[in-house]
């Protein structure tokens, strides 16, 4: 019941370097502590970096979140957003969206991975897994001609997803401009016995794995995450989308969060189906307790 759930401000920035444009917070439980990963800047969005908060309390609503610092993703401190972590074979990994080099006239967001020595420190060089080189990943102009002030090609919002039988690790990411109806999900896949820091271990989907549905009146489907039903029997995708085809680049407030169930194919690849209309009533996730 997100509408009526308790909300709490857990941290307020005091350092000007990370006091503006706080984006995409994620909370993770790692080694008995809570960690929040988020991106922020000093007021210039070209300076976005990743930051980490830590809370040693068992209850994230109790205790105190303290700043562990900025994650240094590369020696040049290139733009970095949308950090997410996952554990595999006893190792901790970070995936995120970043620039190869500082933007001049064209902005290109790519997907990176690195190994971590602890929840706020990388122990390997960043490895490029994907850049927006497919046509459906490079759309930044809306159907009515609206576009940002410069060219933007997007791969962002990477989310790890392990297959149910443990054969694959999928990284589902968002591509194209979120202000366009073309915002969609792509997927990178590696076998769990592969070297995850080897770009050759990853296979990239040629087509979107989840995209707009004009027939259902749903557009700009992206920046997702995953969760299970209370009894662990069902898988759900959480994403944001719009009910309109066209928006201006600054009108993100029209996006709304949506969730729906997805299934697994026999080959251990997810089948997300199509985004459902907001007018459709869905059954509660399996195991939901009645009030």
Where are these regions (language model features)?
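Carbohydrate-active catalytic/glycan-binding domains of CAZyme proteins
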Residues: 1-291
